[in-house]
Amino acid sequence: MTVNLEEKRPEIVGPEKVQSPYPIRFEGKVVHGFGRGSKELGIPTANISEDAIQELLRYRDSGVYFGYAMVQKRVFPMVMSVGWNPYYKNKLRSAEVHLIERQGEDFYEEIMRVIVLGYIRPELNYAGLDKLIEDIHTDIRVALNSMDRPSYSSYKKDPFFKV
């Protein structure tokens, strides 16, 4: 699917309160990916092991989702790409989580817990890397705005994150 990036995207997505099928909770080990998030995009992502995301991939459409994720006992807002990454022509469907506001070293082999609270947009193909990066930054802004509502922000303290 291609999109006209000149069209105005909403600044907030989802209903006022979290509704079914959300929240979706899962956990999995952070594994090595393609190394593109940090190097090419300047937007580091954590790839979740295939076995941990099979259920998610079976029942969720490809696209960009938002919610919270915990790694190393810290909870962060996140955006997650689920799909084939058509710009890169991936052969396997994957789930890649970008922890918003997190800086620091890699955390390969750590267990990440994820709560998905909503859907931002479908997976798209891009003519150039700059448009992809621009859209990811828009996704981050939309996710933060959407999670600023009390029904969503309360999930930052969800019992799923108590370990």
Swiss-Prot record:
This is Riboflavin kinase. SMART domains: Flavokinase. It catalyses: riboflavin + ATP = FMN + ADP + H(+). Binds 1 zinc ion per subunit. Keywords: ATP-binding, Flavoprotein, FMN, Kinase, Metal-binding, Nucleotide-binding, Transferase, Zinc. Its cofactor is Zn(2+). GO terms for cellular component: cytosol; mitochondrial inner membrane; mitochondrion; nucleus. The active site is at E96. It is an enzyme of class 2 (transferase). The gene is fmn1. GO terms for molecular function: ATP binding; riboflavin kinase activity; zinc ion binding. Belongs to the flavokinase family. InterPro entries: Riboflavin_kinase, Riboflavin_kinase_bac/euk, Riboflavin_kinase_dom_sf. GO terms for biological process: FMN biosynthetic process; riboflavin biosynthetic process; riboflavin metabolic process. Pathway: Cofactor biosynthesis; FMN biosynthesis; FMN from riboflavin (ATP route): step 1/1. Gene3D superfamilies: Riboflavin kinase-like. Catalyzes the phosphorylation of riboflavin (vitamin B2) to form flavin mononucleotide (FMN) coenzyme. Zn(2+) binds at T45. Monomer. It comes from Schizosaccharomyces pombe (strain 972 / ATCC 24843) (Fission yeast).
